[in-house]
Structure formats: C-alpha cells, structure tokens
UniProtKB/Swiss-Prot annotation:
Pfam family, one: YgbB
Protein name: 2-C-methyl-D-erythritol 2,4-cyclodiphosphate synthase
Assembly information from the UniProt record: Homotrimer.
Primary enzyme class: lyase
EC number(s) given by UniProt: 4.6.1.12
Cofactor binding annotation: Binds 1 divalent metal cation per subunit.
C-alpha cells in the first residue's frame, strides 16, 4: 500500500476559463496557468507521482516547454496513472479538497465526481470531494489538495 499527496494553486483572473476535475465550470474568473490550470487534476497528478517518488508535474510537464501551453490537464493525469500502473499499482481511493471563494461549487458536485470517476476509473464511493472557501483570506486564487491510496 502506498499513499501519495499533491497540492496545487493558481491565481484567478477575470475572463479566463475555470477548469476543475476535468470540467469547464461556469465562472467569471479562471486560472492563470501555462496549461488549462485545472488545480484539482494537477494536485491528483502530483499525488500519484509522489506515491512512487516520480517527481512532480513540473518535472514531467515543465511550463518552460511550449508543448504544454494550453494543454488539458487530463493528459498529465493519464500519464501519471500510466506511470504508477506500470509499477504494478492500482488506485484504490482519491480524496480532494478544493478551496476557492467563487464560484460556489456545490451545484456542480455530481458532475465533478462523475468526471473524476471517469478519469480515475474508480467507483464514485471511492472519491472524496470537499469544498472550502478561504473565508476571504485569498479570494483571487484556487487551491487543491489531494491524497491517493494505491495498492502495489
């Protein structure tokens, strides 16, 4: 059994798209990032990689490489899954905490969990998804923290 932890954050700016858990969320603000800025998938990618000491998303997909400009974060997550599965691992569970002040994510919970279940190839009851606000401390950013449990 192995546990991995990952974390990611992005500044939010008016007029940019907001991707979370592989979905485009209706929002007046979105992540400033080299890729699509999906903090949830970036945190999950790092969590998977950390469980096997494989570095992090910046090592595998550096923001200095123009190939990754605007890339969907699903690409990064799929590669991290491939790398851990190549070591005989099987993802058992994933838990995420998303922190942002706006937009409110509650109305999108089912769609976000559905997307994670599809991307991670897990049943929905093996995905924890928690929403928090910064209580006004950091209203112009999104942060994601992820923990994964793997067998193998």
């Amino acid at each position: 059994m192995r546990i991995g932890y990952g974390e990611d954050s992005h500044r939010l700016e008016e007029g940019r798209p907001l991707y979370l858990c592989g979905l485009l969320i209706p929002s007046p603000v979105g992540a400033l990032a080299h890729s699509d800025g999906d903090a949830a998938l970036h945190a999950l990618t790092d969590a998977l990689l950390s469980a096997y000491g494989l570095g992090d998303i910046g090592l595998l997909f550096p923001d200095t490489d123009p190939r990754w400009r605007g890339e969907r974060s699903e690409v990064f997550l799929r590669e991290a899954l491939r790398l851990v599965e190549a070591r005989g691992a099987r993802l058992l569970q994933a838990s995420l905490v998303l922190t942002l002040d706006r937009p409110k994510l509650g109305p999108h919970r089912k769609a976000l969990v559905d997307s994670l279940a599809r991307l991670l190839r897990l049943p929905q009851d093996r995905i924890g998804l928690t929403f928090k606000t910064s209580e006004g401390l950091a209203p112009s950013h999104v942060q994601a923290r992820a923990v994964v449990l793997l067998d193998g």
